[in-house]
């Protein structure tokens, strides 16, 4: 028995040294974050990640949101808000807040077909739900008496627990039941630095969790309480702010194709229940597309593009449902 333990420890030490050597000298075939970490759970996944997102010339630096669209003049401070004493609601004016789904070229082309509506679109690729929420808080006073549409992938919630993903970003922390905005002003020039780790242990632990979660890292319920607390905070703050500025709220939730093929993750029921309890209009793309497809796999495959986002066909269904509910 002692001999077995000794031999095991020696092999463990050897394999760990091999991992350390390969990673230190940046061998690409082994320096893959998915081998060691879960991108929905571990900050080290993103510290380990060498991928960078490239924005076009239409975006610029922002000290809280990291990046914003240049043409929208987003205030740089949450203290810049003011209230106009005018409750004349303008039903033809809409402001959009979200991530890559509401900023998708197919979505924008379709929604702009309605010439009777006037749009402002604050959505930006890569935004987490925290950045979506803060983009609204920063500009809510500029969009009084309007319909406000939030649209996000359910997994955008997970981005809220990280201070860095494809770039350095804001982090909202819950400290003694008070939510604090940290890591601002954001330093987008800051580079990720991989800290030391025991990679063999991380590899084995990650592999075990992948088996447990049917090789879908989204199914892991890591930090679920923190994520649910943040979601509740966002919704409650949005409700208070929208009431102050006489705004009508609509939420569109998007799902990955895997949710339609198998079943949605815990995020779906959590978000759906919270929106229902808050009496918020909800365009539920999962329920809509599930019903349209009648769970037919071939039909489901026609709803998504090569970029894993919805395509023109499914965006049309979603936008039709949106306009029915406005």
Regions flagged by a language model, labelled:
Residues 258-326:
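Catalytic His-Asp segment of secreted/periplasmic serine-dependent ester chemistry enzymes
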Residues 129, 133, 228, 232, ...:
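Short, amphipathic alpha-helical "lid/cap" segments that border enzyme active or binding sites
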Residues 155-272, 285-291:
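Serine-dependent acyl-ester chemistry module
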Residues 99, 132, 148, 242, ...:
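Generic structural signal for small/hydrophobic residues in well-ordered secondary structure
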Residues 117, 144-148, 243-249, 278-280:
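Loop/turn elements at helix/coil->beta-strand transitions in domains of secreted/extracellular proteins
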Residues 95, 101-189, 309:
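Conserved SGNH/GDSL esterase-like catalytic core that processes O-acyl groups on lipids
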Residues 27-114, 292, 301:
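Membrane/wall-proximal cationic-aromatic binding patches
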Residues 6-23:
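Hydrophobic membrane-insertion alpha-helices, especially the h-region
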